[in-house]
């Protein structure tokens, strides 16, 4: 069974595209899509008002189980940033994306996204697996 760690780009795509929502519905209902605090914080900032903020917050509580950021994340991120800098790709990787990647790699989860930066990180860190939400579940 494949378990995923959610990036905000994937969640937005799922929420806006009915066919993708259908493709991922069973995986989400089975609890196989997880979330981590930096991703939730990033996503919650997109709420237009308090009502939408509460809707998003409940979505995370009820559907996307929390995955803890590992204590070793800073070391993993530092290694990946150095590899990215050596290839001139370090400016493309946000702090939130790197934390999501470090968490997914640590817990053996596949990053679920709609953002090419995760493909870049996978090329820099062989232990990271990623999946574009448009490709459907593995």
Predicted segment positions?
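Acidic, PIN/NYN-like endoribonuclease modules and their adjacent C-terminal/linker elements
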Residues: 1-3, 101, 105-138
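Active-site neighborhoods of divalent-metal-dependent phosphate/nucleic-acid chemistry enzymes
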Residues: 65-112
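Short active-site oxyanion
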Residues: 1, 30-33, 62-65, 105-110
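Active-site phosphate/pyrophosphate-handling residues
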Residues: 9, 42, 75, 98-99, ...
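A general structural signal for well-ordered alpha-helical segments in protein cores
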Residues: 21, 40, 53, 74-78, ...
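A secondary-structure boundary/capping signal
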Residues: 7-8, 39, 114
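Active-site-proximal, substrate-binding regions of enzyme catalytic domains
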Residues: 50-73
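Short, well-structured N-terminal submotif of metal-dependent ribonuclease cores
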Residues: 1-35, 45-58, 137-138
